[in-house]
């Protein structure tokens, strides 16, 4: 059996960049990581609570955290920032204040910026949320996968692979189903491949969604 490595970690420093940019003393490193995890979870929960979308897609592609001695800069890359801004006009300021209180960053200023990504459905996280929403609404998994592939074709990607694992359609025996369109060269480090794994809770149990998107490169 081939041992599968995380495609993003495999390409760090070549086609992929880090999502956390800061330095710390070795003894404080774990604290910094935990803080990052809490910040990301807090932002995701806030967006989930305040976004009114019919599709159930939050649209967060990634959250970048840059830390300096006196400043924590958080950049949220979103596919549909307009929905968040329209549903809560002062949402960003509110989120900033809540985060500052939550993490007691008295000595450090906390700044949040939102960046819109041009082709939302070219991002695996947003696509996984879309598929999860479809599965929760009891849409057939094959239909959901095909619709996701159609959406990525509009985003000019070179290839996509979607995998769903678990008790699909409520069957008693768990199985893995996958579909691939175009090329997905996982062994080529120069190929820019975006990846995500996402867990969705349905009435039949938990399903795992994995998506690989080949953007460009080689």
Curated annotation (Swiss-Prot):
What protein name is recorded for this chain? Small ribosomal subunit protein uS3c
Task: State where it is primarily located.
Answer: plastid
Any one Gene Ontology biological process term? translation
Keywords (A to Z) from UniProt: Chloroplast, Plastid, Ribonucleoprotein, Ribosomal protein, RNA-binding, rRNA-binding
* Disulfide bridge partners, by residue number: none
Family membership: Belongs to the universal ribosomal protein uS3 family.
Q: Assembly state and interactors? A: Part of the 30S ribosomal subunit.
* HAMAP family on file: Ribosomal_uS3_B
The keyword Signal is annotated on this UniProt entry: no
Matching InterPro entries, A to Z? KH_dom-like_a/b (IPR015946), KH_dom_type_2 (IPR004044), KH_sf_prok-type (IPR009019), Ribosomal_S3_C_sf (IPR036419), Ribosomal_uS3_bac-typ (IPR005704), Ribosomal_uS3_C (IPR001351), Ribosomal_uS3_CS (IPR018280)
**Domain spans labelled KH type-2:** 47-118
Q: Name one GO cellular component term.
A: chloroplast
Indicate where this protein resides in the cell. Answer: Plastid, Chloroplast
GO MF terms here are: rRNA binding; structural constituent of ribosome
């Amino acid at each position: 059996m081939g041992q599968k490595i995380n495609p993003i970690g495999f390409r760090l420093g070549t086609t992929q960049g880090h999502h956390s940019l800061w330095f710390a003393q070795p003894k404080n490193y774990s604290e910094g990581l935990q803080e990052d995890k809490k910040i990301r979870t807090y932002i995701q929960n806030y967006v989930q609570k305040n976004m009114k979308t019919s599709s159930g897609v939050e649209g967060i592609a990634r959250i970048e955290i840059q830390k300096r001695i006196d400043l924590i800069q958080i950049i949220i890359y979103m596919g549909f920032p307009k929905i968040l801004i329209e549903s809560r006009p002062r949402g960003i300021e509110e989120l900033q204040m809540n985060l500052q209180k939550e993490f007691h960053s008295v000595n450090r200023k906390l700044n949040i910026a939102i960046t819109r990504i041009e082709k939302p459905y070219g991002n695996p996280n947003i696509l996984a949320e879309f598929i999860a929403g479809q599965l929760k609404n009891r849409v057939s998994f094959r239909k959901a996968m095909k619709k996701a592939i159609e959406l990525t074709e509009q985003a000019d990607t070179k290839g996509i692979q979607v995998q769903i694992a678990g008790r699909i359609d409520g069957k008693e025996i768990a199985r893995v189903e996958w579909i691939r369109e175009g090329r997905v060269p996982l062994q080529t480090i120069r190929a820019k491949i975006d990846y995500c794994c996402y867990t969705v809770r349905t009435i039949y149990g938990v399903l795992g969604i994995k998506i690989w998107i080949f953007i460009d490169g080689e």
